[in-house]
Amino acid sequence: MERVNHTDFERIQQLRAELVAANNAYYREDSPTLSDAEYDARLRELRTLEDRNPQWQSADSPTQRVGAAPVEVFGEVHYAIPLTSLDNVFDQDGFSDWLARVQKGLGREDVPLSAEPKFDGLSVNIRYIEGKLVQAGTRGDGQTGEDVTANVRTIRNVPLQLTGKDWPELLEVRGEVVIPVAAFRRLNGERLRAGDNPFANPRNAAAGSLRQLDSSVTAKRPLAYFPWGWGESSVPLGKSHIAVMERLSAWGFEVTSYLRGVHELTECQRYFSEMQKIREGMPFEIDGLVFKVDDLLAREQLGFTARAPRWAIAYKFPAHEERTVVEDILASVGRTGVITPVAVLKPVQVGGVTVSRASLHNQDEVDRKDIRVGDTVLVRRAGDVIPEVVMVIKEERPPATQPWHMPQRCPVCGSEVLRLANESAHRCMGGLYCPAQRMGAIRHFASRRAMDIRGLGEKLVEQLVGHGLVHTVADIYHLDEAALCGLERMASRSAQKLLAEIDRSRHTSLPRFLYALGIRQVGEGTAKSLAIYFGDLDPLMAATPELLQNIPDVGPIVAESVAHFFAQPHNRDVIAALRAAGVQWAVVQPQKGGRFQGMTLVLTGALDNMTREEAKTAIENAGGKVSGSVSAKTSYVVVGKDPGSKAEKAAKLGVKQLTEAQFLAMFSEKE
């Protein structure tokens, strides 16, 4: 009989309780009980204990918010009760007309209403069975949405298990996923520093974060969820909207504190004006108020139109919008090579701030809005966020304007500009050479999983580039003690240690070197596959996209990216300089006779006889590769205890599944 480690079990229960309480205090009471560092330390400890004791892992543990393996495409979620949108009004007359229709439909003037902020985010339906979160989906067309369950599970104020009592066996909660304005600014700052396109507004940031195929990315985004309604329920939830929202709060949801009961027109307008005055200081973007008939029986009497309920209306705030002229459109190159069109605007005051530039994001956005130099445009600045060109006023377009097109050559380094399939961004392909990408390329090259040059961190890279000592990654190998000692906080001993690290990195492996080059779409796993297939760098550099696609986990997008990278003369020059500086590796000998030679396996669920990392190492030693997601190219899916959705997807695709015993037996089989 297996002995239970009571100490671990008790600590797991204690940590879960502390983390759930900390989440409630942070999100629902605005009174944090743990610092971020303390929270993270407890979460790490809990994850370690659960890994050590997989029999006590639970779907509602706080550790399950960190994200699941990436998916290739979102599944579908179907709604028995449509997830409808709302009709909008934009002034007092429009609101007054709506209220009059409601009063007429109910045959009385005294109609209690609820009023709450209209959060500017992404609508999501969350389904609970017996109190456990089992599914989450986006609005979609109202009947069918995208399955974003794994991503919603990472949102820290979404209860994975309902709290309190008397919750129904089946419950669908509907609400809005949003991102705080302060977090939005931080996120955009990080994206700009990384050379990525900034999000246009918090709504786009929330939607983009929630619709990540890799839920571990979503887990890093500070999203929040505010319920505003419900869908299916196995029992009636209450007699009024406000009463139901109070029950949702008791069950663990963060219900907005700005929910109010209001009655006649004057009171509604007064609350609308109050909220309009404080909206700029609110932690979340709101673009109006939603007024609803509070009584649920009265709602049934009013019913729905073809697209929206008659018993609710969105009363929108006026937007901060002004007209100005596009004086130029520039192609701006970010640190990762993404080229972003930027509109240079005739300076204009929008919401109290002078706006002279606005990101146009990508070529698709320019084409969709048909923005040209010389156009008069409407510029919006909703709250304190990045300005956005809303639309072109085409009646005022000057004659002889021309559509804007992305340059074919990088405006900074002259390398080829390429747009990969399934991407909206154009990129400069001169990643090793382009000055705009220099800092990012050097940091990545020196990182632990690449060339592993310890001591060559971000601040030192900034100094090396700023002082003109390093222009490409090859220049790292020409640094000397005298040059380094001229930098801030760099004494002789520190310089000698760094030079020793640089010298050590000259002897590397081909997979590390390929990963260090920073080729778009090439991570560590793909770098290893390329190295095993080609054995050395020269045949890889000469490979065509067609040849590259012979590698099991290399599709057309990766093949195109690799081929174009090595086709750039500037990149080839830097690689030649690295080799001339003594960077070298052993030729990779293809693994022969491995049981999983050339195969791709996926692991799901907990294994009894080995950890997941041990299983991965065993597969790689047998010539195989471990992937995080199931596709038609997957050879086997190894299914352990409590498997996730990967097993279901394997069944749908006809991919063979192995039990742990079958998997282990294959190592002793002859090929």
Swiss-Prot record:
Gene3D superfamilies: 5' to 3' exonuclease, C-terminal subdomain (1.10.150.20), 6.20.10.30, BRCT domain (3.40.50.10190), DNA ligase/mRNA capping enzyme (3.30.470.30), Helix hairpin bin (1.10.287.610), Nucleic acid-binding proteins (2.40.50.140). Its cofactor is Mg(2+); Mn(2+). Residues 591-671 form the BRCT domain. GO terms for cellular component: cytosol. It is an enzyme of class 6 (ligase). Keywords: DNA damage, DNA repair, DNA replication, Ligase, Magnesium, Manganese, Metal-binding, NAD, Zinc. It comes from the Bacteria. NAD(+) binds at D36, A37, E38, Y39, D40, S85, L86, E116, R139, E176, K292, K316. InterPro entries: BRCT_dom, BRCT_dom_sf, DisA/LigA_HHH, DNA_ligase, DNA_ligase_AS, DNA_ligase_CS, DNAligase_adenylation, DNAligase_N. One of its GO terms (molecular function) is DNA binding. The keyword Magnesium applies. The active site is at K118 (n6-amp-lysine intermediate). GO terms for biological process: DNA repair; DNA replication. Zn(2+) binds at C410, C413, C428, C434. Its EC number is 6.5.1.2. It catalyses: NAD(+) + (deoxyribonucleotide)n-3'-hydroxyl + 5'-phospho-(deoxyribonucleotide)m = (deoxyribonucleotide)n+m + AMP + beta-nicotinamide D-nucleotide. HAMAP family: DNA_ligase_A. DNA ligase that catalyzes the formation of phosphodiester linkages between 5'-phosphoryl and 3'-hydroxyl groups in double-stranded DNA using NAD as a coenzyme and as the energy source for the reaction. It is essential for DNA replication and repair of damaged DNA. Belongs to the NAD-dependent DNA ligase family. LigA subfamily. This is DNA ligase. It comes from Acidithiobacillus ferrooxidans (strain ATCC 23270 / DSM 14882 / CIP 104768 / NCIMB 8455). The gene is ligA.
